[in-house]
């Protein structure tokens, strides 16, 4: 899997989980302690996040990092 497609799949997984929980990008960003632009860029697959950012997002979405990556990998 190429790096750009990995980022795109990860972003789609985060977007799907966020919308399932009825969270806006702004709300998720606030809960995770990151800027709203980071969430938007991540969901579009144009941001390469740190593990700490992914961990914060996963925690607020109620999933583990493993679940987040498995969901993205299955796309």
Provide a role label for each language-model segment.
Residues 59, 69-75:
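Short, charged recognition helix plus adjacent turn
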């Amino acid at each position: 899997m190429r790096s750009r497609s990995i980022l795109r799949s990860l972003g789609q997984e985060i977007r799907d989980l966020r919308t399932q929980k009825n969270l806006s990008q702004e709300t998720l960003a606030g809960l995770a302690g990151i800027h709203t632009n980071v969430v938007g860029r991540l969901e579009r697959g144009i941001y390469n996040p740190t593990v700490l950012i992914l961990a914060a997002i996963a925690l607020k979405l109620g999933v583990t990092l493993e679940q987040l990556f498995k969901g993205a990998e299955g796309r």
